[in-house]
A protein has these predicted regions:
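Alpha-helical transmembrane bundle of multi-pass membrane proteins
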Residues: 1-218, 223-227, 245-465
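Short, well-structured alpha-helical segments
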Residues: 231-245
C-alpha cells in the first residue's frame, strides 16, 4: 500500500476520538484507589463490603464484555460506543449524588458495563479504520488514553484531597461533593470527559469494514474515500474484505470452532487472562496500600508517579511498536517485569535484615511499571483487535475480553488475601512466575503481526491447524 495515499490526519482523528473511550476506561478503573478509605469510613463498611465496593465495577465490566461483541456486530461499532458513553455519564453523575452505599454500588456497576463495552469496541473500531503500516500505533492510542485516564484519576484524587483540606464553598452541594465527602467529587469528575466522548461520536463514521460485512459496500466506499487519496486503495480494501467473506458463513459459534480460528480464540483468551496475573492490577488497585506498607509517607503521590511513568512509557511504546514489532516488545518488557518483581520481593523479604531504603522498592516498582507499559499493556489490545477474522472479530474479542475481566476481578479479590497469606514477598514472586507461560505462548503461537493487513493475519490463522 502506498504510504502517500493514506490521509493520516483523518485516520488519526478517528483513532483519537475512539481512544477517548480508553481515557474513560482508565479514569473509571483507577479513581477507585483514592476513594476506598473515605467510602469505607463514610458508610462504615465491613471488609466484605469494602471488597464488594472495589469489585462491583469489575462485575459490571464482565457483563459489558459478555455482550459487547454481539452488540457491536449487530448494531455497529459506533452505536455501541454511544451506549458506553451514556453509561459512563449516568455512572459518574449517580456516584456524585448517591444517597446510600447500595446505590453507589449500582452506579459503579453501570460504569463497569460501560468499561466492558468500550474495552472491546473502541480498539476494534480503531483497528478497522487504520491501515496496516500504522495500525499498531493507532490502536496503541487507546492504551495511551487508558494511561492518561489513570494519571488523570491519580491527579484528581491527589488535588481534590488537597482542596478538601484547605477550601470551603458557599454552595452546600459543592461543599458536600468537594470538601465534606470529597470521594463524590473524585468519582463525579468523570462526567466531563464522558459528555465530551458522547458529543465527539456524532462526528465520526461507522467502521467501513463492518459496513462491508453487512453488505453496505457503497456506504463503506464513501467513507474509505476519506481515508485514501487514490481510488484503487479504496477498492483494494473493499475487495480484500469481500474476498475473505466469500468463503465464510454467518457469524455463529460454529465458525469460532473452525480450524485455526479456534486456536486464535484460545490463544487470545490465554494472553488476556494470564496478563492479569502478572501484577499489573495489583499495582493499579492496591498501589497506595502497598506503598504505605513499604513505609512511604505519601502513597497517593507515589501513585501519581506510577501514572506519569505509565503514561510517558506508553507514548514511547506507541512510537516504536510498528518498527520494533509486537513480539520483541513483549520479550524485552516481560523480562524486565520478572527482574523488577523479584527485586520488589527481595525488598519485602530482607528490608529489616539489610535495612534497605524504601526508595530501593520504589525504583524497582517504577521500573516494573515502565516494563509493563512498554510491553503487555501496549501490545495486548493491539493483538486482540487484529488477530481475528472480520466476520467474528466482535464475538472473539468479547470472549477474550470476558477472560481478561474475569482475571482482573480474581486478581482484585485475591490480592489482599495473597498479601496477607503469601506475604508481599511471596505475592510478587508469584507474579514473576506467571510471566513465564505468557512468554511461552507469545513465542510459540503468535505471529509477528506488524506490517500485516487484517486480512493477511486472518489467512495466517485459517492456514494453521
Amino acid at each position: 500500500m502506498n504510504d502517500s495515499s493514506v490521509k493520516l490526519g483523518y485516520v488519526f482523528y478517528l483513532a483519537l476520538a475512539a481512544a477517548l473511550g480508553g481515557l474513560l476506561f482508565g479514569y473509571d478503573t483507577a479513581v477507585i484507589s483514592g476513594t476506598i478509605d473515605q467510602v469505607t469510613s463514610q458508610f462504615s463498611l465491613s471488609v466484605l463490603q469494602q471488597g464488594w465496593y472495589v469489585g462491583c465495577a469489575l462485575i459490571g465490566s464482565i457483563i459489558g464484555v459478555a455482550f459487547a461483541g454481539w452488540l457491536s456486530d449487530g448494531i455497529g461499532r459506533k452505536p455501541a460506543m454511544f451506549l458506553s458513553a451514556i453509561l459512563f455519564t449516568v455512572s459518574a453523575i449517580g456516584c456524585a449524588i448517591t444517597p446510600t452505599f447500595d446505590w453507589l454500588v449500582i452506579y459503579r456497576m453501570v460504569g463497569g458495563v460501560g468499561i466492558g463495552v468500550v474495552s472491546i469496541v473502541a480498539p476494534m473500531y480503531i483497528s478497522e479504520v487504520s491501515v496496516s503500516q500504522y495500525r499498531g500505533r493507532m490502536v496503541s492510542l487507546y492504551q495511551l488514553a487508558i494511561t492518561v485516564g489513570f494519571l488523570a484519576a491519580y491527579l484528581v484524587n491527589f488535588l481534590l484531597l488537597g482542596v478538601s483540606q484547605s477550601h470551603s464553598f458557599a454552595s452546600s452541594q459543592f461543599q458536600l461533593i468537594f470538601v465534606d465527602e470529597v470521594w463524590r467529587g473524585m468519582l463525579g469528575m468523570e462526567t466531563i470527559p464522558a459528555l465530551f466522548f458522547f458529543i465527539l461520536l456524532f462526528f465520526i463514521p461507522e467502521s467501513p469494514r463492518w459496513l462491508v460485512v453487512r453488505n453496505k459496500s457503497a456506504q463503506a466506499t464513501s467513507i474509505l474515500e476519506k481515508f485514501f487519496s487514490e481510488k484503487k486503495e479504496v477498492d483494494a480494501v473493499v475487495s480484500q474484505v469481500q474476498s475473505n467473506l466469500a468463503s465464510q458463513v454467518k457469524t455463529d459459534w460454529h465458525q469460532l470452532l473452525r480450524p485455526g480460528i479456534f486456536t486464535a480464540v484460545v490463544v487470545g483468551v490465554c494472553i488476556a487472562i494470564l496478563g492479569q496475573f502478572m501484577g499489573v492490577n495489583a499495582v493499579l488497585y492496591y498501589g497506595p496500600s502497598i506503598f504505605k506498607d513499604a513505609g512511604m509517607t505519601d502513597p497517593l503521590f507515589c501513585q501519581v508517579l506510577v501514572g506519569i511513568v505509565n503514561c510517558v512509557t506508553t507514548i514511547l511504546a506507541m512510537s516504536i511498536i510498528d518498527k520494533v514489532g509486537r513480539k520483541k516488545l513483549i520479550y524485552y518488557g516481560v523480562s524486565g517485569m520478572i527482574l523488577s518483581l523479584l527485586m520488589i520481593a527481595f525488598y519485602f523479604a530482607f528490608t529489616e535484615a539489610l535495612n534497605l531504603s524504601v526508595y530501593f522498592m520504589l525504583s524497582f516498582f517504577l521500573f516494573y511499571v515502565f516494563c509493563c507499559a512498554i510491553s503487555i499493556s501496549a501490545v495486548v489490545w493491539v493483538l486482540l483487535s487484529e488477530m481475528y477474522p472480520n466476520s467474528v472479530r466482535g464475538v472473539a474479542m468479547s470472549i477474550a475480553g470476558f477472560a481478561l475481566w474475569i482475571g482482573t476481578y480474581l486478581v482484585g479479590q485475591l490480592t489482599p488475601w495473597m498479601l496477607t497469606s503469601l506475604t508481599p514477598a511471596g505475592t510478587f514472586i508469584f507474579f514473576a512466575i506467571m510471566c513465564l507461560p505468557y512468554m511461552f505462548i507469545m513465542w510459540k503461537y503468535i505471529p509477528e503481526t506488524a506490517g500485516m493487513s487484517l486480512e493477511e493475519i486472518e489467512r495466517y490463522w485459517t492456514k494453521r491447524k
